[in-house]
């Protein structure tokens, strides 16, 4: 694969010419609705099909990582790709995240489009220098002359009984960095449309999946199954409309928020659930528009509470919609401790549906103190 880049450069092609194959992501509304579902698709199948279609459409796209080839991926996301595209485009690497991530960034410098898979995003810490100091900063440091079209993808956050070193959520970590885009799919539609957008994007994208979602099935429409389907980066989706309280969530927590909303509806509380999809850039407009309608906000994430995604959302609402709030913002996050290994303690460290229900009720039944409104 790297030889392709060398031959291209050797033929006198400028890096800018190599980037001409970039296909813009299709523009779409923040809240998309589709006709009746054409079929059910798992998140695993959605990711696999997106990779397959993008590799078929663009020969500069390739996949690299530990066990992505012969083993077809630790979670079988790359099933069938080695047989179809060969070892030049589906590269099994040694167990050295720093090594193969650096190779991927170098390939992106030369106009290729690497998709780098981490077996878990916890292992991306081994490659943090290449992700932050090389991939994220090169466009700025080159005054826009160098694009780095690379995707870093893999499971992020808590799974089931894998301990503190395999369970951390890195959404807030990477969202802190200028030059990176951070995507967090929930459904099969999200996974398929956002991965296509990430691969086509001219900038580095951190694509945070969830191990527990890989096997979950979601209804998808014929439009989602079309090879041209692509979701816009930076646009949230309103999964459920409501009028009493806004709940923001991403990745697996979206499902929890929807379950909580169903419980709340039986008690007369109408919750609006926003699937963030994109953490950086953050769809502040959709969030603030919802809060201006419901006048209450609950933020939900499984990462650590301090300096988290919820804190950023809260600040956005304070800056743009403070006068619309009828109650203090409720923030739900994981426990401020490394993830326990024991199943009972692990459950206590991750937000649960009942936590969301309680927070939404607090938001609905509390009011801003009179002193604060004076």
Curated annotation (Swiss-Prot):
Binding site for thiamine diphosphate: 97
Residue range of the transit peptide in the UniProt record, numbered on this chain: 1-34
Database matches in InterPro entries: PDHB_mito-type, THDP-binding, Transketo_C/PFOR_II, Transketolase-like_Pyr-bd, Transketolase_C
GO MF annotation terms: metal ion binding; pyruvate dehydrogenase (acetyl-transferring) activity
Cofactor: thiamine diphosphate
Broad EC category: oxidoreductase
Subcellular location: Mitochondrion matrix
Keywords (A to Z) from UniProt: Metal-binding, Mitochondrion, Oxidoreductase, Potassium, Pyruvate, Thiamine pyrophosphate, Transit peptide
Chemical reaction(s) catalysed: N(6)-[(R)-lipoyl]-L-lysyl-[protein] + pyruvate + H(+) = N(6)-[(R)-S(8)-acetyldihydrolipoyl]-L-lysyl-[protein] + CO2
GO CC annotations, alphabetized: mitochondrial matrix; pyruvate dehydrogenase complex
EC number from the UniProt entry: 1.2.4.1
Superkingdom field: Eukaryota
GO BP term, pick one: pyruvate decarboxylation to acetyl-CoA
Principal localisation: mitochondrion
Positions contributing to K(+) binding: 150, 198-199, 201
Function summary: The pyruvate dehydrogenase complex catalyzes the overall conversion of pyruvate to acetyl-CoA and CO(2). It contains multiple copies of three enzymatic components: pyruvate dehydrogenase (E1), dihydrolipoamide acetyltransferase (E2) and lipoamide dehydrogenase (E3).
Assembly and interaction partners: Tetramer of 2 alpha and 2 beta subunits.
Name of the protein this chain belongs to: Pyruvate dehydrogenase E1 component subunit beta-1, mitochondrial
Organism: Oryza sativa subsp. japonica
